[in-house]
Amino acid sequence: MAMTLKEKSANTHVKTEWPAALKAEFAREAERPNGCVGSELLSETGKLRVWTIRLKPGERIGFHRHVLNYFWTSVNGGRGRQHLMDGTTVEYSYYPGETRHETYGAGEFKVHDLENLGDDDMIFITVESIEGSANKPLPIPDTVRLKAA
């Protein structure tokens, strides 16, 4: 069953004082929006972008911006921490196969990061809908695109 962030309760959801380095990274993202919503872009067509995120224990993917309708699926579950654009910090437990869908109207977006708090790798697949989204996709660098073996 798909859930939105609002439907799933966080294990913790608090307003915290972020470290200076995190604040600086967030400010840089605001100046230059980061459309890399995953670690690696596996596939891209005129309709979809398919990403993977693989985080080792303690590893973090930096602040990035969601502007397109999308869904993600947790491949193997785990525990993660996100710093959200409203200044809150949330922690979630994810279960294998958990899937969430999010949509954005014209001009709407979400900025957040994700850190693996668990003892095992945390893996997600994210699929962005280019076609049917109210916003245009953000540019992404070639360095995140899957390289053929």
Where do the protein language model's features map onto the residues?
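His-enriched metal-coordination microenvironments in redox/metal-binding proteins
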Residues: G62-V67, H112, N116
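A short, N-terminal "cap"/entry segment at the start of jelly-roll beta-barrel domains
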Residues: A2-T52, Q82-L84, T89-V111, E115, ...
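Short, surface-exposed binding/anchoring microloops in extracellular/periplasmic proteins
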Residues: E44-T45, I53-R65
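Glycine- and acidic-residue-biased ligand/ion/polar-headgroup-sensing regions
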Residues: H66-D86
